[in-house]
Amino acid sequence: LNKEELVHILSARTLDGTIPGLYQALQNGHAQAIKSYGNLVLDTIDKNIDLEYLISAFKYETHSSNKYTPGLFSAFQNGHADAIKAYCGVLGNSNLTRGEIIRMLEARNYDGAPGLLLAYQNGDINTIQSFFDSLIMLDISKDFIEELLTAKHYDFTG
């Protein structure tokens, strides 16, 4: 297999190419699958651009590559605290830059809404606490923790 074929296989996207397997695991709260997938990808892929593509787990809206939702966003939406913790563990074990990790932790959808905002709206204390604990585990600076926990909605739609 060449690198492109391997990345395609590891993305485990649906037949129409819009939904990656990791997105589905995050959406459905399959923490062990997230850990196992993360280990497989981290052991197999060495280029950050491919790693970021695979771990970001963007679901693209049908017929629009401009509209996407990260898997972590769906985990927040559905209150999957263990899945969020597992995902953060994968990020912590990766060689992604601090900036790349923070961008993924924001979990913003195509219109700028951060995933954590949904946990706040749902009053999901367990998910919020799990995310906070994960930020500490990832050794994220206090300033970035404050920014992430503020969960500001930036309107990207213009």
Model regions and ranges:
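Ankyrin repeat domain, specifically the short helix-to-loop turn at the C-terminus of the second helix
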Residues: 1-9, 36-56, 86-104, 129-148
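Low-complexity/repetitive intrinsically disordered segments
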Residues: 1-15, 27-30, 148-150, 154-158
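Ankyrin-repeat boundary/linker signal
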Residues: 13, 58-64, 105-108, 141, ...
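Conserved ankyrin/ankyrin-like repeat signature
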Residues: 32-33, 83, 127
